[in-house]
Amino acid sequence: MRVLGIDPGLRNMGWGVIDVSGTRLAHVANGICHSDSGDLAQRLLSLHRQLTDILARFAPDTAAVEHTFVNKDGVATLKLGQARGIALLVPAQAGLAVGEYAPNAVKKTVVGVGHAAKEQIQHMVRLHLPGVELAGADAADALAVAICHAHHVQSSGRLEAALARAAR
C-alpha cells in the first residue's frame, strides 16, 4: 500500500510518500509545495496543481491529512483552513480515501508522546524510515502523518479480522 501524508500549510505544504508492506515501512519521496505571497486564489491554485502533480507522479493508494488548529489570529486560521481544503480535495478528486488525524495523535503514534517537539518528530521519522533525507520540517510532519495512517490502517485491519474470527 502506498500512502501520501500531507501537512497543510498555505506558504509551505509538506508531503511525504511511503510504501507499507505488512509492518515494514519504506520511504518513497518527500517534499514541500510552496506558494508565493500574493493573491490567495492563485496561491491555492498553485498548491492544487503541485499536489495534483505529486499524486500523478507517485500514485498513492490512500492519503492522510493532519488537522489544523485554531489560533488567536482568525484570518490566518481561515487561510490555513483553505489550504487544508486543497489537501483534502486533491486526493478525493483522485478517488482516494483520506484519513484525518489530530497533530497530537500523529505525535503519539510516531514519537510516543502527544506533545513532541519538531526535532523529536524528525528524529523518529528518520528511525522509522532509515536513510530518508528530509526536505524540511513540513515534509517530516507529512511523513509522520503517513506513518500514523499506516499504523491506523493496520490496526483497523487487525481489529476487523479479530471481529470476523469471533463472529464465526
Curated annotation (Swiss-Prot):
It comes from the Bacteria. It is found in: Cytoplasm. GO terms for cellular component: cytoplasm; Holliday junction resolvase complex. InterPro entries: RNaseH-like_sf, RNaseH_sf, X-over_junc_endoDNase_Mg_BS, X-over_junc_endoDNase_RuvC. Its EC number is 3.1.21.10. Mg(2+) 2 binds at residue 66. GO terms for biological process: DNA recombination; DNA repair. PROSITE patterns: RUVC. Keywords: Cytoplasm, DNA damage, DNA recombination, DNA repair, DNA-binding, Endonuclease, Hydrolase, Magnesium, Metal-binding, Nuclease. It catalyses: Endonucleolytic cleavage at a junction such as a reciprocal single-stranded crossover between two homologous DNA duplexes (Holliday junction). The active site is at residues 7, 66, 138. One of its GO terms (molecular function) is DNA binding. It is an enzyme of class 3 (hydrolase). Gene3D superfamilies: Ribonuclease H-like superfamily/Ribonuclease H. Its cofactor is Mg(2+). Its main location: cytoplasm. Mg(2+) 1 binds at residues 7, 138. Binds 2 Mg(2+) ion per subunit. Homodimer which binds Holliday junction (HJ) DNA. The HJ becomes 2-fold symmetrical on binding to RuvC with unstacked arms; it has a different conformation from HJ DNA in complex with RuvA. In the full resolvosome a probable DNA-RuvA(4)-RuvB(12)-RuvC(2) complex forms which resolves the HJ. Belongs to the RuvC family. The RuvA-RuvB-RuvC complex processes Holliday junction (HJ) DNA during genetic recombination and DNA repair. Endonuclease that resolves HJ intermediates. Cleaves cruciform DNA by making single-stranded nicks across the HJ at symmetrical positions within the homologous arms, yielding a 5'-phosphate and a 3'-hydroxyl group; requires a central core of homology in the junction. The consensus cleavage sequence is 5'-(A/T)TT(C/G)-3'. Cleavage occurs on the 3'-side of the TT dinucleotide at the point of strand exchange. This is Crossover junction endodeoxyribonuclease RuvC. It comes from Cereibacter sphaeroides (strain ATCC 17025 / ATH 2.4.3) (Rhodobacter sphaeroides).
